[in-house]
Amino acid sequence: MGVGVLEKLSRKTGVIVGDDVLRLFEHAQQNNYAIPAVNVTSSSTVVASLEAARDQNCPIVLQLSQGGAAYFAGKGVSNDGQQASIAGGIAAAHYIRSLAPAYGIPVVLHTDHCAKKLLPWLDGLLDEDERYFKLHGEPLFSSHMIDLSEEPVDYNIQTTAAYLKRAAPMKQWLEMEIGITGGEEDGVNNEDVDNNSLYTQPEDILAIHKALSPISPYFSIAAGFGNVHGVYKPGNVKLHPELLKKHQAYVKEKIGSNKDKPVFFVFHGGSGSSKEEYKEAISYGVVKVNVDTDMQFAYMSGIRDYILKKKDYLMTAVGNPEGEDKPNKKSFDPRVWVREGEKTMSQRVKVALEDFNTAGQL
């Protein structure tokens, strides 16, 4: 292993932005690793993720989906006009910004899929980014994702370019998607999609690069190479990571780049993929891998096992197998059983950090 990524970063701990995000992704490409992007929905899932990255001595991406951001605000808040998703996203960002330095690792603060119908959510967060930028010289979020993969390619590229123009003065990263990722994710259902549209064409990657590069270097592309969101059995999905290799070679040749990997790729719909598929995709320039479904299951499993094991101590506030007057507070205190979910989720994040070669990269 070469020089650790901390040597490259101006901010060593906490939420990183701008050139530091670029340096992190460049370091990832050069050293054949990717950073897992964990969807967080609560303070509890945030700390489970931060703890795993700290213990594995590596960076992490924490991301909020539109639904996850609304959940952060509370299910009792109306989401008319995306107000809960905007308020929850901002609250989560401030929470992560204030807490992340305590874990001593660099963190990329990101928002996940934003389809066309959810653009008012992204607009509201960008308003807040610009306000924060005026005060602090950096945006609130390190990066955002715009997902117009269901729209015509020209509209996708033009609209993404317009958003990158808005983000560029803040040196804010923008992730975009081209080609469809199958399955179901917040607000986007592509379960019945024709298989061929799961594979992005190299001409599209080049068109994106040509449109976005003159605006800003701070962008990445989630390309379809057979990926599917959600839960599926290994072998049911035909992934073709080698397409990413072809895309890189095509773009390199067409733009005359001296880099073998001129494009920063993102791997979506990764739950259930094999370690070999991850490693192959990473070798072709994938710098970020979205992981959500597996983490949700891991979080639940710790709480499930605790509840099943402690069932006789959770039926009443007082009274258990040790005596009808024995209190159960130590068993039903949320800090006890929620922590069980954090522990199992944290363990699962650690597995991802190993699988993607992220562990030890500081």
UniProtKB/Swiss-Prot annotation:
Its cofactor is Zn(2+). The active site is at D112 (proton donor). GO terms for biological process: canonical glycolysis; gluconeogenesis. Pathway: Carbohydrate degradation; glycolysis; D-glyceraldehyde 3-phosphate and glycerone phosphate from D-glucose: step 4/4. SUPFAM superfamilies: Aldolase (SSF51569). Its EC number is 4.1.2.13. InterPro entries: Aldolase_TIM, FBA_II, Fruct_bisP_bact. It catalyses: beta-D-fructose 1,6-bisphosphate = D-glyceraldehyde 3-phosphate + dihydroxyacetone phosphate. Zn(2+) 2 binds at D147, E177. Dihydroxyacetone phosphate binds at G230, G269, G270, S271, N290, V291, D292, T293. Binds 2 Zn(2+) ions per subunit. One is catalytic and the other provides a structural contribution. The keyword Metal-binding applies. CDD domains: FBP_aldolase_IIA (cd00946). It holds the Pfam family F_bP_aldolase. GO terms for cellular component: cytosol; mitochondrion. GO terms for molecular function: fructose-bisphosphate aldolase activity; melatonin binding; zinc ion binding. Zn(2+) 1 binds at H113, H229, H268. D-glyceraldehyde 3-phosphate binds at S65. Homodimer. Belongs to the class II fructose-bisphosphate aldolase family. This is Fructose-bisphosphate aldolase. It comes from Aspergillus oryzae (strain ATCC 42149 / RIB 40) (Yellow koji mold). The lineage of its organism: Eukaryota, Fungi, Dikarya, Ascomycota, Pezizomycotina. The gene is fbaA.
